[in-house]
Amino acid sequence: MAKLTKKQKALASKVVAQKLYPLQEALTLAKETAIAKFDESIDVAVNLGVDARKSDQVVRGSVVLPAGTGKSVRVAVFAQGEKAEAAKAAGAEVVGFDDLAAEVKAGNLNFDVVIATPDAMKVVGQLGQILGPRGLMPNPKVGTVTMDVVTAVKNAKAGQVQYRTDKAGIIHATIGRASFSVESLESNLKALIDALAKAKPASSKGQYLKKIAVSATMGPGVRVDQSTVVA
């Protein structure tokens, strides 16, 4: 394990391990521990009471963060005809079908989100080995396989984030940047937690939201008192 620098040790000392902080105080600490020269992400880790080994307990979906992500998103859409024109009008940077598939196969992936109409999945399905490992494969569960390409493009541009439990049943997501106000980060985190609550699997028993922690990219984790998050 790499040794902490003096500056990192000083930052870590600001945060009391295992202490539960009220949400606004936790976010303030996360912002204060972001000292890199770039605008660090503010991330959240949510431990869920699910058995991620069971397919019916995998929590997956998407949510539009009200204050956005602070990131400019390039969108690619696989569609034809009217849907292709609608996607372009909605602001998609890259729109195509077989021609776009050829670009992807050639290694030209100059986009952050991929959306597809259902009929395009016969083409997109052949790109799984390229798109899948990069987290770009369209999926109806997160709203990226849809006939409503206009809404999908607008959501992606507006700050939609996708989430999925990892093998340990933890959701990792970015809720903004260190330059965001505490209020903006708070509204984004609450929107994510609300979405996760609605996505609770019917087979999940016991406590569902087990632990919430926020952190800057290079900063220590700050545990959040859940009573200050969930109404």
From Swiss-Prot:
Q: Which InterPro entries match?
A: Ribosom_uL1_bac-type (IPR005878), Ribosomal_uL1 (IPR002143), Ribosomal_uL1-like (IPR023674), Ribosomal_uL1/biogenesis (IPR028364), Ribosomal_uL1_3-a/b-sand (IPR016095), Ribosomal_uL1_CS (IPR023673)
Q: Does the keyword NAD apply?
A: no
Which domain of life does the UniProt lineage start with? Bacteria
Q: Which CDD domains match?
A: Ribosomal_L1
- A Pfam entry, by short name: Ribosomal_L1
Gene Ontology terms: cellular component: cytosolic large ribosomal subunit
Disulfide cysteine pairs (residue numbers): none
The biological process GO terms on file are: regulation of translation; translation
Q: Cite the entry's keywords alphabetically.
A: Repressor, Ribonucleoprotein, Ribosomal protein, RNA-binding, rRNA-binding, Translation regulation, tRNA-binding
Query: Keyword Ribonucleoprotein: yes or no?
Result: yes
Q: Which GO terms describe its molecular function?
A: rRNA binding; structural constituent of ribosome; tRNA binding
Complex formation: Part of the 50S ribosomal subunit.
Family membership, please give it.
Belongs to the universal ribosomal protein uL1 family.
Per the entry, what this protein does is: Binds directly to 23S rRNA. The L1 stalk is quite mobile in the ribosome, and is involved in E site tRNA release. Protein L1 is also a translational repressor protein, it controls the translation of the L11 operon by binding to its mRNA.
The identity of this protein, by name, is Large ribosomal subunit protein uL1
From what organism does this protein derive? Dechloromonas aromatica (strain RCB)
